[in-house]
From Swiss-Prot:
Annotated region (Disordered), positions in chain: 201-223
This protein's name: Catalase-peroxidase
Enzyme class, first EC level, given as a word: oxidoreductase
Entry's EC annotation: 1.11.1.21
Length: 748
């Protein structure tokens, strides 16, 4: 026997006990380096917008329309039409979005990857994606998977007689699973005990509807934020009822909370459920124990397909997906009002599917023979409903809307078209990001509209003059930088909302957020508005400076002054072109979830949380699309610029506040300082001179983690070095400029 045979490889790179195994509460800095160029197979200069705009979208749609009725033997189409399957694919791609943190949604094509590709609620969607491959192959990189999923859903609707509201492209694919999305703590599929077992305080929607988009609603179940789905591996609610209990009224409570957390009101919710369930069927031909492992657990020879079904033929009439066997309407491949006709036209009783799942059929055998079979023309069935469908009849608010839609089919069609468009585009950000010839002309309030630039912009000479005015206004460096940061740092890379453009910091609700220090904010805005009015009043030819631009420019001017006082003559990049939104263009309830209830960059915590502040900082930095070095240099710069929200001035490790130095890092890692907790919860600390015992500094957990965590300390050492001052200033300005321009999609 050879030596090679005697000494086989038992382990490979990355195997063995990991740091995460040893220290499960470690700071996950890798969340700040996701989706890097190293994972992207496309050329560095690939421009997706340019590629998509070169696409013949009509030709793509024509090919998709042909696919709808091109039934394949390996996965036959129900009723001879793949439309319902593709609607479900698009719906489930977009439906993971939640307004609480903006994560999830269709924007990255994440349905291709774990865990979503293997969620119990996504059974058989692996087949839908394989059916699409010939079209993706044909058009290649001109259309992303993310865009193709949603476009296919639209074409599915259109080929079944429905007029959609429009389509916007622009979703760029990623090439690895998202690691930052919190799907829940449950360790078993369809588990829901932990997301309802946490007693955190959450806002309850008031009568005006404020809070409905991200808080809990009445019903006694306290769903953990930011989750929207009721169970691990579901997109929305359990169709059988809460935890499988077939109680339509209780189901209505879950529906209202879940859809609200997806930014949908009651009318949009009814339209989406009824509109989606106008088409197709569910699948529960036999017991679930006939279904094999999900794609991520399947054998190599299955080539990424999962849920191999041993019941009968394993496909067609023998398909098992949800375990429910429901066909809602008599025309499952045609747009109609038949869902409501059946919902209100029959009295319903509980039954079970062949797989043993709870579902509903008309009482006394009514409706027999009115529903076609999906694969055998000689067979007919009774209509059937899910518990979550019956909820639309028993809940008073839903019932009122549903009857109105039943009696006004054109209104229903319009409501569904708009709700479907919102569902599939909610995570794309402002309308300026949409691509293609089918983008609707109408501005919608949930798109956070901002007026287009309609006047000449300030030039370099104007910028210099405005900087002088700002610096002579009596406002401090801290006040100017704080205001600019507050305006820009609402941005979320998850759903592309927030940011400095629009100057919504002067409007409700942002002007009243605790993190923005409303009194100081009002003072700064009053001065800046005066400078704006004076400048605009003296211009000819319609030239103006928006308040949105002036807020950012003022922050840049303050940083230049702070760097100058440290001996560095710098120019902070500034590009005009922001506009000011109005209060009428700002949905207060919709913006409420953007409130930073924690912001480590300003040492702010609205209340105490179970999650340590340093972990919340990583969450905030990830939403701001920052890398670990960018986060680090921003913290160090903002601290010495005296940007904070606490009276204790935690983390201001300098005797020259307002001057852009690397003092934060030098003093943090100085071994002459000994740190001690100053609160029982170890949320604040004091730094003492090791020799004299004299107190030198105070700090938060966020401050000290840059000296405690090994990776962050390594970064801090770079900026604390004697030769690092120039680099620190350069890197801070670069990271600052990035944040100020995160929502400047016109520059990208």
């Amino acid at each position: 026997m050879s030596n090679e045979a005697k000494c086989p490889f038992n382990h490979t790179a990355g195997s063995g006990t990991t740091n995460q195994d040893w220290w499960p509460k470690r700071l996950r800095l890798e969340l700040l380096s996701q989706h890097s160029a190293k994972t992207n197979p496309l050329d560095p200069d690939f421009d997706y917008a340019k590629a998509f705009n070169s696409l013949d979208l009509a030709a793509v749609k024509q090919d998709l329309a042909k696919l709808m009725t091109d039934s394949q033997d390996w996965w036959p189409a129900d009723f001879g039409h793949y439309g319902p399957l593709f609607i479900r694919m698009a719906w489930h791609s977009a439906g993971t979005y939640r307004v609480g943190d903006g994560r999830g949604g269709a924007g990255r094509g994440q349905q291709r990857f774990a865990p979503l590709n293997s969620w119990p609620d996504n059974v058989s969607l692996d087949k839908a994606r394989r059916l699409l491959w010939p079209i993706k192959k044909k058009y290649g990189n001109k259309i992303s998977w993310a865009d193709l999923f949603i476009l296919t859903g639209n074409v599915a609707l259109e080929t079944m007689g429905f007029k959609t509201f429009g389509f916007g492209g622009g979703r760029e694919d990623t090439w690895e699973p998202d690691q930052d999305v919190y799907w829940g703590d449950e360790k078993t599929w369809l588990g829901g005990d932990l997301r309802y077992g946490k007693n955190e305080a959450q806002p309850v929607a008031d009568k005006a509807g404020h809070g409905k988009e991200h808080g809990r609603t009445d019903g006694g179940r306290n769903l953990e934020n930011p989750l929207a789905a009721v169970q691990m591996g579901l997109i929305y609610v359990n169709p059988e009822g809460p935890d499988g209990n077939p109680d339509p009224q209780a189901s209505a409570h879950d529906i209202r909370e879940t859809f609200a957390r997806m930014a949908m009101n009651d009318e949009e919710t009814v339209a989406l459920i009824a509109g989606g369930h106008t088409f197709g069927k569910t699948h529960g031909a036999g017991p679930a124990d006939n279904v094999g492992p999900e794609p991520e657990a399947a054998e190599l020879e299955n080539q990424g397909l999962g849920w191999k079904n041993s019941f009968g033929t394993g496909k067609g009439s023998d398909t098992i997906t949800s375990g429910l066997e429901v066909t809602w309407t008599s025309t499952p491949t045609k747009w109609s009002n038949n869902f409501f006709w059946n919902l209100f036209g029959y009295e319903w009783e509980l039954t079970k599917s062949p797989a043993g799942a709870h579902q509903w059929i008309p009482k006394h055998g009514a409706g027999a023979g009115s529903v076609p079979d999906a694969h055998d023309p000689s067979k007919r069935h009774v209509p059937s409903m899910l518990t979550s469908d019956i909820a639309l009849r028993v809940d008073p608010a839903y019932e009122k809307i549903a009857r109105r839609f039943f009696e006004n089919p054109d209104e229903f069609a319009d409501a569904f078209a708009r709700a479907w468009f919102k569902l599939t585009h909610r995570d794309m950000g402002p309308r300026v990001r949409y691509l293609g010839p089918e983008v609707p002309a109408e501005d919608l309030i949930w798109q956070d509209p901002i007026p287009k630039v309609n006047h000449p912009l300030v030039d370099d000479q104007d910028v210099a003059a405005l900087k002088q005015k700002v610096l002579a206004s009596g406002l401090s460096v801290s006040e100017l930088v704080s205001t600019a940061w507050a305006s820009a740092s609402t941005f979320r890379g998850s759903d592309k909302r927030g940011g400095a453009n629009g100057a919504r910091i002067r409007l409700a609700p942002q002007k009243d957020w605790a993190v923005n220090q409303p009194e100081q904010l009002a003072k700064v805005l009053k001065v800046l508005e005066g400078i704006q009015a004076d400048f605009n009043g003296k211009q000819s030819g319609g030239k103006k400076v928006s308040l949105a631009d002036l807020i950012v420019l003022a922050g840049c001017a303050a940083i230049e002054q702070a760097a100058g006082q440290a001996g560095h003559k710098v120019t902070v990049p500034f590009t005009a072109g922001r506009m000011d939104a109005s209060q009428e263009q700002t949905d207060v309830a919709s913006f409420a979830p953007l409130e930073p209830v924690h912001d480590g960059f300003r040492n702010f915590l609205k209340s105490r949380y179970d999650v340590p502040a340093e972990h919340l900082l990583i969450d905030r930095a990830q939403l701001l699309t920052l890398t670990a070095p960018e986060m680090t240099v921003l913290i160090g710069g903002l601290r010495v610029l005296d940007v904070h929200t606490d009276k204790e001035k935690h983390g201001v490790f300098t005797d020259r506040p307002g001057v852009l130095t690397n003092d934060f890092f030098r003093n943090l890692i100085d071994m002459g300082t000994e740190w001690k907790p100053s609160s029982p919860a170890r949320e604040s600390f004091t730094g003492h001179d090791r020799k004299t015992g004299k107190q030198k500094w105070t700090a938060s957990r966020v401050d000290l983690v840059f000296g405690s965590n090994s990776q962050l300390r390594a970064l801090s050492e770079v900026y604390a070095s004697d030769d690092a001052q120039d680099k620190f200033v350069r890197d801070f300005i670069a990271a600052w400029t990035k944040v100020m321009n995160l929502d400047r999609f016109d520059l990208k």
